[in-house]
Amino acid sequence: DFRPRPNGIAILPDGGWLLTHLGDTEGGVFRLTPDGELTPFLTRVDGLDMPPTNYVHVDGQGRIWVTVSTRLQPRDLGYRSRCSDGFIVLVDDAGARIVADGLGYTNECLVHPETGQLYVNETFARRLTRFDVTVDGDLVRKTIITEFGEGEYPDGLTFDSEHGVWITSIVSNRVIRVARDGSREIIVEDSDPDHIAWTEAAYLADQLGRQHLDKAAGKKLKNISSL
């Protein structure tokens, strides 16, 4: 029997959940009902079988946003600063389609509940990016809000009441608040300087792999990946 490897989970307004399948070679989004029934929700888009799929978000209008980090397999080939084959899928009343492509390891994305803009972390491009969303759901006016530095690999995100964006950074085990003007403040940190240095050297040499992510741990916290 097929069992998804859920990486992202979203609650549906009418009950149930959407799960992203982050398989070794396959992806997609699956719907899980409260009684335990699992059915495919999205397995192909624009003629493409969904690669291993990272994240799913249901916005305030009921639109569904899905991220794929990389088309490369194995996925750790995408752990490169120059890799830009990640994309974002929108599922709405018009169907499913890719609305942004060429992203640097697309991770969590959220639509801001007040501004209606979409924010997305590009983990191995090490930046937080924002798009305006048109009435038809197209993503336009791509803006880099901030770029991250040594040991910082943005993964999860959420918003606060002052239009700040809270970001989790794997490897450095940080929670970083990014203000509206792009300034940054470290809120939480539990990191190992030796591990950061080892990982940074591999990243700069295009040799970053799973071992650099899986071994990361602070004194009290393991990898902080989501909020």
Where on the chain are the PLM-derived regions?
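A short beta-strand motif characteristic of beta-propeller blades
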Residues: 1, 39-46, 95-101, 141-148, ...
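Beta-rich, blade/repeat-based domains predominating
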Residues: 2-21, 46-64, 70-72, 82-88, ...
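Short loop/turn segments immediately following the C-termini of beta-strands
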Residues: 22-24, 69-71, 123, 133, ...
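A detector of repeated loop/turn-to-beta-strand junctions in beta-rich toroidal repeat architectures
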Residues: 26, 82-85, 125, 139, ...
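A short loop-to-beta-strand structural motif that recurs across blades of beta-propeller domains
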Residues: 28-30, 86-89, 127-129, 174-176
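Beta-propeller blade signature
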Residues: 31-36, 81-94
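Structural recognition of the beta-propeller blade-terminating site
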Residues: 33-34, 77, 92, 132, ...
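Short loop/turn segments immediately following beta-strands, especially the blade-tip
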Residues: 131-138, 180-185, 190-191
